[in-house]
Amino acid sequence: MISNLQKETWAQLLGKLDRLPHALLLHGAPGVGKLALAERFAQLLLCEQRISAFHHEGQGVAPCGTCDGCRWFLAGNHPDARIVEPEAVALALARPAPVAEEGEEEKTKDTKPSIQIKIEQTRALADFLNLASHRGGRRVAIFHPAEDMNTATANSLLKSLEEPPPDAMFILVSHRPARLLPTIRSRCVQVPVPLPEPKAAAAWLAAQGVRAPERWLAFAGGAPLRALDYATGERGEAVERVLRGIASGNLAALGEIKERDELEPLAEVLQKMALDRAFASLSGRTKYGGAAVPGDARAWLAYARAMGRNRALTRHPLNPKLFAAEMVAGMPKT
């Protein structure tokens, strides 16, 4: 499992069991296994063999996987656990969508899945946390990604963090903790989740059937789950097409993209290529596995920033062909 690549972080979490805080904030780059760690720790807290498990030492402590608590958690229906995340994230992870409140079904039937955690979700969570535990133990709530909250939702969570119900445990998972309210961060014990050791991550990818794992790991910036997504998903196919176009020098073809779904992968590849060109100029090294071709570092860094902005713009209505052509045309010549 991916959490095996984060043994040191898992050991840190186990070290907090004796004096468990009411809120943890696991933060790090996307794709390093933060959610897997959060879910595994939540499962451990709900494991009905946990009393004997907690007396073991070292990284071998883990949920038993066979008790009712573990089986319910793994099936996604433990009565004392909640995962609070945007509808779009739940859909991408093949989880059941949050149950609509009365009167909400008709309003949401024809709308796109939300990309934010809704205020209704935190209110429902507050109701859940104020009930007695079904199994006589803790109640655990995972927020993922925690930064995907608007101001009203964040303030609702803050209220629960300021006055946590007895035996309630909050686990926040964040790719960008700076986007959280400072008052939320200050009420959590922060646990940084680093990039795994590259050789171990490449070996894990190879075990998942990924070909050329080092290449995909480099392109993903060292994040193994992102590398797995690139190597096995539709996004990876789009990235491959862009990489082949760049390798062949056929940049004009990249500007002929007509499908909106290929715009963000194009912007991502161009951004990472630009960063590699800048890094090569400054240090002779690259970060994302691109060719170490030096150039005007300032120009390539400016282009990388522009592509970062374009990655956000690709979610909005626009002309795919025109937008792609503009991105390619703006590439530095040196």
Roles of regions detected by a PLM:
Residues G136-V140, P165-I171:
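Loop/turn-to-beta-strand initiation segments
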Residues D127, K159, P182, S186:
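Conserved adenine-binding aromatic site and its adjacent loop/helix in ATP-hydrolyzing domains
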Residues N130, N155-M169:
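Conserved catalytic/switch belt of AAA+ P-loop NTPases
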Residues T151-N155, K321:
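Conserved strand-to-helix beginnings and helix N-cap segments that scaffold or border functional pockets
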